[in-house]
């Protein structure tokens, strides 16, 4: 029986800004259908790790693999960059990212926001994309907002539209960077429910979050980052229920207060 490679794999990733080392040898893997949550204090390297995974930023050393395919690099250290632009474009289109700030185009309707990348980047048929975009907006509870402008939506609705936009690219994996942290608690739950639905469908996701309940409820694996290193990782029930690291115990106590 053939074993599928991980959907995403990070090997010994190092990333620094000048003398500040933000990631100091991080490795993890997400199997197809896995939900991996990255938790930790602000400044621990979570968002940087996600951006390096999607090649929005480049690491100084280490490997990024998508479905077993390693990124080709040229140069070393701070001059390192991908050697194959076509490879980067292809992999990025299969790794849709949802940001903390929704980043919807203010001059486009909600429907056009969701359609824009598949039509302009993937050169897909607009009629086919529109049908798909309407379906994804309905999926996230915004079927009646297709013709609305982003300014007419609440924060929770804008983030759900951003998730629909990411899904419309038909990615193999979703990367979500603090998708609920800019929202008040009531609006946050709108987005949490969508993420829970996606997890139940078996979507491969890597989520950076400060929401410990979300991480515990939807994750197959949770990684606690501290000062650019993986301090502890494991199944959510084990990591939250019986943390081994004193630093993790302190963190969980602080976020629960």
Show where each model-derived region lies.
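Conserved ABC transporter NBD signature motif
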Residues: 62-76
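Catalytic Walker B motif of ABC-type/P-loop ATPase nucleotide-binding domains
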Residues: 174-177
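Conserved ABC ATPase signature
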Residues: 149-153, 157
């Amino acid at each position: 029986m053939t074993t599928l490679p991980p959907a995403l794999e990070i090997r010994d990733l190092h990333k620094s800004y000048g003398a500040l080392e933000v990631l100091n040898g991080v490795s993890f893997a997400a199997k197809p259908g896995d939900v991996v949550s990255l938790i930790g204090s602000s400044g621990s390297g979570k968002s940087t790790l996600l951006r390096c995974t999607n090649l929005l930023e480049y690491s100084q050393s280490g490997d990024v693999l998508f479905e077993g395919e390693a990124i080709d690099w040229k140069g070393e250290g701070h001059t390192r960059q991908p050697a194959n632009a076509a490879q980067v474009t292809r992999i990025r289109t299969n790794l849709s990212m949802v940001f903390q700030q929704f980043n919807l185009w203010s001059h486009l309707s909600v429907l056009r926001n969701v359609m824009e990348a598949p039509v302009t980047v993937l050169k897909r048929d607009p009629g086919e994309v529109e049908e798909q975009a309407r379906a994804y907006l309905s999926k996230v509870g915004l079927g009646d907002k297709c013709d609305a402008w982003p300014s007419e939506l609440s924060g929770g609705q804008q983030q759900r539209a951003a998730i629909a936009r990411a899904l419309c690219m038909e990615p193999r994996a979703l990367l979500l960077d603090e998708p609920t942290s800019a929202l008040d608690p009531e609006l946050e739950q709108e987005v949490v429910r969508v993420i829970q639905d996606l997890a139940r469908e078996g979507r491969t996701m890597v989520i950076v979050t400060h929401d410990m309940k979300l991480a515990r409820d939807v994750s197959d694996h949770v990684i606690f980052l501290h000062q650019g290193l993986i301090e502890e990782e494991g199944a959510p029930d084990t990591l939250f229920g019986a943390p081994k690291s004193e630093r993790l115990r302190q963190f969980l106590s602080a976020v629960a207060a």
